[in-house]
Amino acid sequence: MSRISRLGACAEELAIAATTIAAFCKHHSNSGLPGDSIPPDAPQKVLQAKQSVITNSQKLEVLLAEPADFIQRLARENQLLACLQWLGEFQVLACIPIVDSVHYSDVADLACVPVDQLRRIARMTITAGFLQEPKPGYVAHSGLSAPFVKQPVLLDAAMFLSETLAPSALHMSLATKRHGRTHQTDQCAFNTAFNTKASFADSLGRRPRLQRQWPSFSRYAIADDEAGVEDVMTRLDWLSLGEATVVDVCAKTASLATALTSKYPSLRFVVQSEEQCQNHTWSRSLSATKLHNGLSTPPESDTGPAARAAKASERLELQQRALGSPQNVTNAAVYILRLGTASPFTSWHKLRAQATAELSAHADILRKEHGSRLILVTRTLPKPGEVETTVEAMARFRDLTLMQLANVRELETSEVVELLNSVHIEGGCLVLTNELRTRNSGMIAFEATYQPQLLG
């Protein structure tokens, strides 16, 4: 496709998505609800439209940008990060009322900072929609900046980015000069940037500020794996199973099971957790789901959304099960195994050992229960162009973050395939029958079944 054709296609997709969002916001506004934002629980069509606008906007920028535009964008983003770090360091955001404007000098007095610096820094962030100046000399929160006061974890994530990850990233070349190719966790860009022999994991245990910031950064900057799992798994042909039991092994939440049982009335889900306390978390999660679906009162009909959600929760069972222990559910049609994702604390060698233990625990069941399937779900590094550019950019970002902080890397698809092929089962082996990845997610599902060894 030519450059002009790609421009036209992106512009058309963006216009369609923007129209969908505008219609949703207008409807919300007419209903007496805030109409200037898209809530997380908006219809899937609207959330997809939002992602389409973001993706196509970035595609258009890439298609049109000249070298000078590229340098200028990097310069702006560099200054925005520095400004956000400055605002966070002096607690400036907390000095601005959530619902009103205030004079710059009053904020400067409260934060004990020079008013001229505050004005220049705030006006830079305003160009990105962070804060606003409703009238000359007065500053106020915007829809983008207010959550950083209401949810301090957002500011923690930004501070980790500016104080820890950015310096580490900028020392990547020096780390390569000093150590070359290495897998040692104490010889990475983080160590070079902060002149320490302690690994990132060790530093986390010693520095409370870093210990508080990392989970926030991981949550908001590295993205939600569970959403990606649901995106991939809901595309499988569940209807073909009929009335069947599905086991979600070592799940962190019951969200996937809740989504699938609500959509497919013939499925029964067993959700297994490694920790006892998770059951309480899931109970609260399921209660919240019922409330969200209007189940705090008896459903008005047997066919409405509330009634369907109530029936779905009846087909969902929670269990505790230790990692690698024998599987007590032996008659399921599908076993969903979550292969953990790489992190500064978990290398591929550790993930492989955990996955091997789980695969071995299910191997005999697959051999005895002909027709049972195993689905291994994980996050892998996509091949260039395999997913949307925004998804690939996040995947590359995660991979480089792991390298800079701990000399760890994201998994390759070939490594997961090799892992499945390495599982030995009496009288046969696991055979990969399907790989499923969507262009909107970094998650991938590997479907495998037992195949008897041919004699002779």
Swiss-Prot record:
Chain segments carrying region Disordered: 290-314
Keyword DNA-binding: yes
Observed effect of gene inactivation: Strongly reduces the expression of dothistromin biosynthesis genes such as hexA, hexB, pksA, adhA, vbsA, dotB, ver1 and dotB, and the subsequent production of dothistromin.
Domain of life: Eukaryota
Subcellular location(s) of the protein: Nucleus
GO molecular function annotation: DNA binding
DNA-binding span(s): 104-123
Keyword terms: DNA-binding, Nucleus, Transcription, Transcription regulation
Main location: nucleus
Cellular component GO terms, alphabetical: nucleus
Induction annotation: Expression is 8-fold up regulated when aflR is deleted.
Annotated Polar residues bias: 290-300
InterPro entries the record matches: SAM-dependent_MTases_sf, WH_DNA-bd_sf
Segments forming domain HTH iclR-type: 74-143
Role according to the record: Transcription coactivator involved in regulation of the dothistromin biosynthesis gene cluster with aflR.
Name recorded for this polypeptide: Dothistromin biosynthesis regulatory protein aflJ
Organism encoding this protein: Dothistroma septosporum (strain NZE10 / CBS 128990) (Red band needle blight fungus)
Classification of source organism: Eukaryota, Fungi, Dikarya, Ascomycota, Pezizomycotina
